[in-house]
Regions:
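Hydrophobic ligand-binding cavity/cleft-lining segments
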Residues: 1-45, 163
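Intrinsic-disorder/low-complexity, polar/charged segments enriched in Ser/Thr/Lys/Arg/Asp/Glu/Gln
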Residues: 1-9, 15, 51-53, 65, ...
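Hydrophobic/aromatic beta-strand elements that line small-molecule binding cavities or substrate pockets
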Residues: 6-8, 40, 66-72, 83-84, ...
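Short amphipathic alpha-helical segments
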Residues: 13-19, 133, 137, 141
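Short acidic, gly/pro-rich beta-turn/loop elements at beta-sheet edges
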Residues: 18, 29, 64-66, 80, ...
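Conserved catalytic core of Hanks-type protein kinase domains
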Residues: 20, 30, 72-73, 136
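Glycine-rich portal/gate segments that line the openings of hydrophobic small-molecule binding cavities
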Residues: 38-88, 106-108, 140-163
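Beta-strand/loop substructures that line and gate deep hydrophobic ligand-binding cavities in soluble
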Residues: 84-139, 156-158
Length: 163
C-alpha cells in the first residue's frame, strides 16, 4: 500500500515528545483503541531494538497479530518502526514518526504508515477498506497522544512484558 501520513500538533517541546515516543511501552497508551493485548518483546522498552507484539482489532481481520521494532532512532527528529502483520506475518509494516518544531514550544508530529502486502488477497483486503480504517485509527491515536502529553488525559495502560 502506498504510504499515508497523518499529523497533529502537540503543545510540548520536541525533545519531550520524542522521549515519550522512544519508549515503545508508551505506544499502548495512545493506540489501545485499535491495538489490543500490547506486549513488549524485551525488557528494555526504550530506543533502537525495542519492540512489541499486539492484536490489530480491525473488522473482518482473521489474522490479527502483528509486531513492530524500533529500527531507526534519531533524537529528537525521527523514529522508525518496522514489523510484520497478517497470516504467517507475511505483510511488512513500516511506521515513521517525524517531529518538526512548531511555533512557540509546539511540535508537529507526522506519522507515516506503509504496508507491503505479500499476496493478491492481502492487497484486496487493503483496497476493501483496511487502508482507510488504519488512517482513521492513526489520526485518532495522534489526537490521543496530544491529549496525553498536553493534558494528561485519555491515558491508557502502558505495555508490559509478554509472559
Amino acid at each position: 500500500m502506498d504510504p499515508f501520513t497523518v499529523t497533529a500538533t502537540v503543545a510540548r517541546p520536541r525533545e519531550e515528545v520524542f522521549e515519550y515516543l522512544a519508549d515503545i511501552a508508551n505506544h499502548a497508551e495512545f493506540t489501545d483503541h485499535f491495538l489490543k493485548d500490547f506486549r513488549l518483546t524485551r525488557e528494555q522498552s526504550y530506543g533502537r531494538g525495542a519492540g512489541a507484539r499486539y492484536r490489530v482489532n480491525m473488522p473482518l481481520n482473521r489474522f490479527p497479530w502483528a509486531d513492530t521494532t524500533i529500527v531507526e532512532f534519531d533524537p529528537p527528529y525521527r523514529l522508525v518502526e518496522e514489523g510484520r502483520a497478517g497470516k504467517y506475518n507475511r505483510i511488512k509494516v513500516s511506521t515513521e514518526y517525524r517531529l518538526l518544531e512548531g511555533a512557540g514550544d509546539t511540535t508537529r508530529v507526522e506519522l507515516t504508515s506503509e504496508t507491503e502486502p505479500a499476496l493478491v488477497t492481502d492487497r484486496l483486503l487493503e483496497k476493501l477498506g483496511a487502508r482507510g480504517w488504519l488512517r482513521r485509527q492513526n489520526r485518532r491515536a495522534l489526537r490521543r497522544l496530544r491529549s496525553i502529553l498536553e493534558d494528561n488525559e485519555l491515558r491508557g495502560r502502558r505495555a508490559t512484558l509478554a509472559r
